[in-house]
Amino acid sequence: LQGGMLEMHQTTFGGLAALFGPAQVLDLPYTFADDAVAECVMDGPLLAEMGKSILDQGLGLRLMAVGNTGGWRSFATTRQRIQSPADLARLRIRTLPSALEQEMVRELGGSPTPLPWSEVYYALSAGLLDGTKNSVQDVVGMKLHEHIRFLLVDRHSYMGSMWWYSEKQWQTL
């Protein structure tokens, strides 16, 4: 996208954090009380300023739209129910490569395991992961429920979606 080979791409808030650290603020656990609050933030000046800052820094990305990718992140596990933070002790939980997401799992006693989304199904089926942090829609859509036995609907993170256009392509329009 930055080089102009792709015109558009979608990232989550957490995914953007690998490129633009300040985006992590959008992925702080339990920041948004509900959809209405999250949508108010997404439609407000914070996201507009973030998009402008990314463009001004020359990262080659132009923010086009912000939405939701399918709900809220919650913990889903293969072998044990989570009723307290102690239940996460030593569990290998899939995270994004975001330092914030990894630190959250670590602080709860789990073992953060950054893994590409395309590898999560296999990792759960092979026992390489004990759980993940995804929305119910993601769990069902990727058939993770075939291996997931427990779901703690804690809604710790709003799964915001940002649609980006290549600045290189934009300049050719």
Predicted regions located by residue number:
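A ligand-binding cleft/hinge motif common to bilobed small-molecule-binding domains
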Residues: Q2, F13-G21, S118-S125, T132-F150
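Contiguous mixed-secondary-structure segments that line small-molecule binding/active-site clefts
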Residues: E7, T12-S111, A123, L144, ...
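Short acidic-hydrophobic, aromatic-tinged amphipathic segments that line or gate anion-handling sites
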Residues: T113-P116
